[in-house]
Amino acid sequence: MGIDSTLTSELDIFPCRCLELGAGTGLVSLAVAKMLESIGSTDADIVATDYYPSVLENLRRNVTRNLLSEGVCVTSKFLDWSTFYHADIIADPVFEGGFDVVYGADIIYEALHATWIKSCLERLLCKPSTRRPDPTFHLVIPLRATHAVESSTIEMVFRDDGEIYEQQEHVLVVKYKEIIVCDAESGKDGEEVEYAYYKIGWS
């Protein structure tokens, strides 16, 4: 199952609200925006978020440089995972109302990141509805030996444990996992990098 085809089917419902966590340069959000343009989106909002001021400034510049059609809007916003989930009031209205699709690439590099992200998703990812039966968080991470412990936290934090969660109506769990093997950036013959692709949603 390709990531592109999966995202396309999920994005082809309008209006559509998308959120990127740890956007960095904004490459993923801009690629999603182009995908939305290609399928004729007339009402799509993409919010690309990051924490570091210097990264956000570069993100804003990249968004401004990439002209998009009127039907697709990309904005950049500050988001601190470690504080957002327990804030009494959502300070920025852009985060109100929930998101249909959330995605993140290479954003797990500390032991608490998965926990913080799950807590944020519990407030930000839309609950299942007739219009959007399966809101999803798409996560891709490189499987680095140096970050094996941090990577393992994803399946621990988003585990489907029926005994613990049976009394809760909606719980975020890993619904799909795929290992993707790519050639390494070094260009050396035979050198490859493995990525884990997760689809996380409400049980």
Which residues does each PLM region occupy?
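S-adenosylmethionine-dependent methyltransferases
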Residues: 1-203
